[in-house]
Amino acid sequence: MTKTQKAEIIEVLSNEFKDAQSVIFCDYKGLSVSKLENLRKMARAKDTKVQVVKNTLATIALSNASLTGVELKDTNILVWGADSVATSKVCADFAKDNEKFVIKSAYVDREAADAAKVEAFAKLPGREELLAMLAATWMAPVTCFTIGLDALRQKKEEA
């Protein structure tokens, strides 16, 4: 790989990491190409990106994006996205099905985190689920009021 190619990769990754709310580092030793392709498909469905990058290039790109505090060792596959919960869910769900896929560390909400924090974020409801819960909470008083009015109407009709 030439210096210009490395510089291009660093520039692209730096821009990607600046926009990302979470970057997760995972070990993928022993996984087949087809399983990694399944990970990429899962990630694409959640607007999350997956890439294997050399540790030195990733470290430079992360520092350019003001993300420091995590040391990269051994082989790593990087998973990143704008939604911390969705990115964490992609990694956690894939790790459940593939024991060789191990979450090592991460930046979650742009702060250094361990695998336990990634697992905790994966258990949170997603954005759509939270919006549905909020709408249901807002609609509860109106729904109860409507049910009460309907019961009152039925009672008056019977009398």
Curated annotation (Swiss-Prot):
CDD domains the UniProt entry points to: Ribosomal_L10
Keywords: Ribonucleoprotein, Ribosomal protein, RNA-binding, rRNA-binding
GO annotation, biological process: translation
Gene3D superfamilies linked: 3.30.70.1730
InterPro entries tied to this protein: Ribosomal_uL10, Ribosomal_uL10-like_sf, Ribosomal_uL10_bac, Ribosomal_uL10_bac_type, Ribosomal_uL10_CS_bac
Superkingdom of origin organism: Bacteria
Any one GO molecular function term: large ribosomal subunit rRNA binding
An annotated GO cellular component: large ribosomal subunit
Protein family according to the UniProt entry: Belongs to the universal ribosomal protein uL10 family.
Function per UniProt: Forms part of the ribosomal stalk, playing a central role in the interaction of the ribosome with GTP-bound translation factors.
Subunit structure: Part of the ribosomal stalk of the 50S ribosomal subunit. The N-terminus interacts with L11 and the large rRNA to form the base of the stalk. The C-terminus forms an elongated spine to which L12 dimers bind in a sequential fashion forming a multimeric L10(L12)X complex.
Protein name: Large ribosomal subunit protein uL10
